[in-house]
Amino acid sequence: MKISRLLPAAFVALTALAQSSDNSTKGSSVSYPVSLNGINLLSASAANISAALFAGNITSLELVDAYIARIEANDRQGLELRSIIEVAPTAREIAAQLDQERAAGNVRSSIHGLPIVVKDNYNTDVELGMNTTAGSYALLQSQAKGDAFVISKLRAAGALILGKANLDEFAGIRGSVTSAWSGRGGQCQSAYVVGGFAAGGDPGGSSGGSAVAVSAGFAAAALGTDTEGSIVNPASRAALFGLRPSTGITSRTGVVPISTSQDTTGVMAKSVWDIAALFEIMAVHDPEDAYSEAAEPFRRQNYTQFLDGNGFQNLRIGIPREPFWNETSQGYRSAITAGLEATLEKIRSLGATIVDPVVLPDAEKWKYSFVGGAERNSNGTIVIQYDVKEDMAHYLTTQRTNTSGLETLGDIITFNDAHPDLEFPPGYCCQATLVAADQLGPRNTSGEYWNAKWNQQQLNEEGIEYLFREYDLDVLLVPTEGGSSRLGAVGRSPIGTVPVGYDEINLPYGMAFVGRRYDEPTVIRAMSAYESHFPKRAVPPTLD
């Protein structure tokens, strides 16, 4: 990967404003900016950065130069975080344009000039100078037709797309490989664990690169996608706030798909304001997304209005002990249990009504997992395998140009088989899930598919919806580890994760508020209340 280099003159100007750090004992031996005019790039939220931009204390161009310098120091050298696949070669030019607009009094929105990174499965227009590949060399053979729908909305609001983040290749649907590894990006690793991935610093997936980039101070915020846990899990492991929106409330058009039944597009950032400010721009109707119309009555133009530091008052929170708080059945690290329980008690003391436990009917049905292979061992894996075959073909034929004959899932499989040196390096073989999906027939005439879809719907109605009705709940509260993200997948529901603590190797962990479908306002309220009363997230010790 070639990251665009800072121009020497720009770097000289930058160092006049920035404090630098020689992190040779922790990361890169290359000096890189730590702060700009009092804004610490490692800890500052998008809200902090936006305020500094509005105050005229920093410019978007200065931010871009600083972020690129930080990426160059520790992404492919230094700590080798491997969170970024490409940096936009046009970023400095666009930043200068946005600064000129601001100087002329033309500020598009609260995120005007804010540099963000987006997962490499979001289409970005070729004018930005970046590829969209889902981490795969196969998609490097073609170009995106234009911006994904949500990218177009964010750019119109003045957001600056700084780069494309690493991910599980094809967002984890390819087969059994480690989290946040892709052929193009390599193995992403946590900035929080000394020794990185080899020492247990698994960043989570599939949006691991997005999360690590924000935690390392490479961008103000990031976009991820979530089919089951792909925003919630990596955000948690990077000590970030993250929002997995209800499926359909944000558009998926122009995003490399896994499953139209479950996919969603969302945000990871360092504060809840950051989440709400980006989400409210993304949450608009898209006539090309089949799931968008159903969400229209529930959309709000302003989601920052739901930030409420006293939001726990009179909030009814359900605790589904089985199976999601059971460390034995769910396999999450026992070292985090005490922190989870202490957090729960503090939330109770802040005025929330804690209903503990709430009993999930047929809890055993929730103890499935996506094994990442050919097996269709649950309703979820059945639906996803049928979906990816047809959804990928639709994406390739409607959202790409110059496809070089790459029009079906089978074409991707064939490319990968023909290029094992690129796609199957030692330890990262193979593509069993894609192969199994490609062998399936049409989903519209498949009894297996529609039966699985019906079963998923019943699991939601008789499980998640039952809990909300039976116990008169506002949200559920669950650990982010241990499979709780399937509540969002099955319910197509919003999940908001908050940072809680750090385990014995300093890997962060979190908790998540789960709302009813389209009830993002209550989830944001709960996240905001949490943020107001709990300690600020710690920055990665490898970079501090």
Regions from the language model: what does each represent?
Residues 37, 112-139, 306, 311-324, ...:
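Short helix-loop capping/hinge segments that flank enzyme active sites or metal/cofactor-binding pockets
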Residues 56, 113, 119, 156, ...:
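Glycine-rich, small-residue loops and helix-cap segments
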Residues 2-103, 341-352, 539-544:
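An N-terminal boundary/leader segment
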Residues 244-341, 361, 418, 537-544:
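A short helix-breaking turn/cap at a secondary-structure junction
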Residues 64-65, 334-359, 391-399, 412, ...:
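Acyltransferase
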